[in-house]
Amino acid sequence: GTYKSEVFHSTEGLKEFVRYIDHSKEKLIDDVIHIVTEKQGIPVEVAMTYNTSYNESVYSYVNDIHTIEGGTHLAGFRRGLTRTLKKYADDSKLLEKAKVEITGDDFREGLTAVISIKVAEPQFEGQTKTKLGNNEVTGAVDQAVGEALGYYLEEHPKEAKAIVEKVILAASARVAARKAREQVQRKSPLTGGGLPGKLADCSSKDASICELFLVEGDSAGGTAKQGRDRTFQ
C-alpha cells in the first residue's frame, strides 16, 4: 500500500496556541508573554496572556504529553506567577487601594497560558497517569516564570497596571459574593413567606440549632404537637 503523510507546522508555536485559545475572548493586554529558557537543566517554555473573562485556561505539557491533571510544573508556574505579580504590585504601591485580601486565584482570573517542559525521566501520577510528579520541576518553572515575568512587568508598566487592576477587581468581586452568600444564609428561610401547610415556626432564628420536627397531626387520639420544643423545633 501507499503511505500518506501530512506535516503540521506552527510558525509561532505556543504563542500562536494561546492566541487560538483566546480567539473569541476580549483581550486585556495585546501581548502574549513568551518565555523560553532552561533552569536546573530543565527546558521550560511558557506562553501566557490575560483576557477580560472570569475564567482561567491553563494547559500543561511534559515531553509534548498533555498533563490533564497538572502536576509539579503547573504548581511551579502558579507559584512563580503569584509571587512575581504580588511583588510587582506591592513595589508599585498598586495594591494600596485594594481593601481586600488577594489570593492566588485572583491572580489567575482571565489568565490563558500554555506550559511546556522537557524532562529526561518524567514520573507520572494520578489515576490516568497524566499528572507530573517530579519535585525538581517546581523550582525550575517557578524560577523561569518569576524572572521573565518580572522583567516583562518592569518593561511594560501599562500592561502590568491593567493586570493588577483586574486582580483587585477579581478579589473585590469574590469578597462581595461571599458576603452576599453569608447574608442569605443568616436570614431565616421562612422570613416573610409564612409557613407552608401545618408547620409551626420555632422562636429561635439561629439556623445552626434549629431542626424540622415531624409529629402526628390531628387524629382520633388527639395531636402530638405539644411534644416539640418550640424554641428550636
Where do the language-model regions lie?
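GHKL-family ATPase ATP-binding module
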Residues: 1-233
